[in-house]
Regions:
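N-terminal non-catalytic regions of secreted/periplasmic and cell-surface proteins
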Residues: 2-7, 248-279
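Acidic/polar, compositionally biased interaction segments
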Residues: 5-250
């Protein structure tokens, strides 16, 4: 007997033109709201929905009636901002180079620090970030994985802000460094917009993004491994400087919000439905 993996069939409509491809690598967009501002270890409480809320700058300081400061932007003074960073691959750990996860100095992959962490107040807690890339994928089946402390959500969609993007992997909660493995099926070769939301409440913090080939774990975009999945940042995206709004885009129109939100409770039957589409 044999077991057929439970593949997510990725929509071929997500493929973007080759003209969107920038340099090799990922964009790491890290945010932090720690106990030094709020008195709480984290505001997102290790939940996907709240991590998205933090990343969007939607947690409000009740005294100033403005968003809390992003401690992972060293140029921040007040309010919400971002400081996206280019990385070649994703093998990060708050205690680098101490070994955590599958890839470490023990097997030739010394852990790297999480960009801009510790933040303003020297904390390593209350983090929510995203890792963005265009993955070059051929037709066929792929096994992907994320090793994380704490949780994550991986998606493929027409654009990075696409709320209708396909979820291909998720761990919605807190945990120590652990693997989540998931399978996808590609029916059309091309560049696919890939996003991993990652978050950490307190204690340890790490993330690795990889594929699995014949039982071997391979970092996505490892230039030293033949056949490693290649990743590229979208052309024109800002890196290594402060921005007030995230600008990584594929140029494709996407649904960026739906009101009422999925799962929202106590919605009046007469309430209107609002869908916002942005290019």
């Amino acid at each position: 007997s044999f077991t057929v993996p439970n593949y997510v069939v990725v929509s071929a409509d997500s493929v973007v033109p080759g003209s969107t491809k920038g340099e090799s690598g990922f964009i790491a967009n890290i945010t932090q709201i720690s106990t030094e501002q709020t008195g709480k270890e984290s505001l997102h409480n290790n939940k996907v929905a709240n991590a998205e809320k933090q990343l969007n700058g939607e947690f409000i300081d009740p005294d100033l009636e403005e968003p809390w400061m992003n401690e992972a932007d060293f140029d921040a003074e007040e309010g919400w901002s971002y400081y996206p960073v280019w990385v070649e691959w994703v093998n990060q750990n708050q205690d680098a180079p101490n070994p955590v996860g599958n890839f470490s100095a023990n097997n030739g992959y010394e852990d790297e620090y999480i960009p801009n962490i510790p933040g303003w107040y020297d904390s390593t807690d209350g983090i929510a970030g995203e890792y963005l890339a265009l993955l070059q994928l051929d037709e066929g089946a792929y096994t992907l994985g994320v090793n994380s402390d704490d949780g994550f959500r991986a998606t493929i969609g027409v654009n990075y802000n696409d709320v209708l993007a396909q979820e291909i992997g998720v761990f919605d909660g807190g945990r120590g460094a652990s693997d989540s493995i998931f399978d996808i099926l590609i029916t059309k070769a091309g560049l696919y917009p890939f996003r991993v939301l990652w978050f950490e409440g307190g204690g340890g913090a790490n993330i690795e993004i990889f594929s699995v080939v014949d039982g071997e774990k391979i970092l996505i975009n490892d230039p030293d491994v033949d056949g490693a999945i290649k990743a590229f940042i979208p052309k024109g995206a800002t890196v290594d400087e402060q921005i007030m709004e995230r600008d990584a885009t594929t140029g494709r129109a996407a649904v960026v919000s739906i009101t009422p939100a999925s799962g929202q409770k106590r919605v009046e039957s007469a309430s209107s439905i609002e869908v916002v589409i942005e290019n």
